């Protein structure tokens, strides 16, 4: 069994968005060595991937970009340009109650696929933590952002890896799980995050400029308004 109780190395899933950059800086504050991993998975635009590159360079962390063509599978407005990304007004955000329906922006099994690659990278880099920016408060109905999903994946990870069976427990860290978007932004600011580098929009253009109307833009807008922090960053 492993005698170490202090995590040293972490792999961070970095999309280029607001949540993932906050996770990256949180990991830098809590782990000795951090590797960021991003995915070119056939998303609508490369602007978020370009943002991830800039963020990783600014944070001075190792950065891996892995190609996975989820566009071949389709099934999501984020990977199939024939599907329309809806405006936020078509989604019920009242009282933070999640709609029972799963939105068209859900990418089938995306977090499971991404976490599986991150798990392999964690073994290669001898990391005992994977950090992911899932959120159970503003999660928009995605099934792979729920606490029970994360717990199940962590259990599987420790059954399915050499490190796990040798007693080196791997933890799926979710520092944003129970935070509101405003609380996430405040945390990031306290850690030195430059949110001007991030791309949140589902319909961002090639330069990363936001549409200001989609689900993700709405949550970002509400977060900055409630946090009362630099409103010029709302539509970036």
What name fits each language-model region?
Residues 129, 164, 195, 225-228:
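Secondary-structure transition/capping residues
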Residues 66-68, 194-203:
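Conserved S-adenosyl-L-methionine
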Residues 199-222:
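Local cysteine-cluster metal-coordination motifs and their immediate loop/turn environment
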Residues 2-191:
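ATP-dependent adenylation/nucleotidyltransferase module used to activate substrates
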Residues 213, 223-232:
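Short cysteine/histidine-rich zinc-coordinating motifs and their immediately flanking basic loops
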Residues 234-236:
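Conserved small/polar residues in nucleotide/adenosyl-binding loops
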């Amino acid at each position: 069994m492993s005698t170490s109780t202090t995590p040293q190395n972490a792999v961070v899933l970095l999309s280029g968005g607001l949540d993932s950059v906050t996770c990256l800086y949180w990991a830098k504050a809590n782990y000795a060595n951090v590797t960021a991993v991003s995915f070119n998975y056939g998303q609508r635009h490369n602007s978020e991937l370009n943002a991830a590159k800039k963020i990783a360079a600014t944070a001075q962390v190792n950065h891996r970009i892995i190609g996975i063509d989820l566009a071949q599978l389709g099934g999501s407005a984020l990977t199939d340009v024939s599907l329309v990304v809806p405006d936020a007004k078509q989604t019920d955000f009242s009282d933070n109650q999640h709609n029972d329906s799963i939105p068209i922006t859900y990418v089938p099994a995306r977090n499971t696929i991404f976490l599986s690659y991150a798990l392999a990278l964690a073994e290669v880099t001898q990391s005992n933590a994977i950090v992911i920016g899932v959120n159970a408060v503003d999660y928009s109905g995605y099934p792979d952002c729920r606490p029970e999903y994360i717990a199940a994946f962590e259990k599987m990870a420790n059954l399915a890896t050499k490190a796990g069976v040798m007693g080196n427990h791997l933890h799926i860290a979710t520092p944003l799980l129970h935070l509101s978007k405003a609380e996430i932004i405040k945390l990031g600011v306290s850690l030195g995050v430059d949110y001007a580098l991030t791309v949140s929009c589902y319909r961002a253009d090639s330069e990363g400029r936001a549409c200001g109307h989609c689900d993700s833009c709405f949550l970002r807008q509400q977060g900055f308004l409630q946090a009362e922090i630099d409103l010029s960053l709302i539509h970036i």
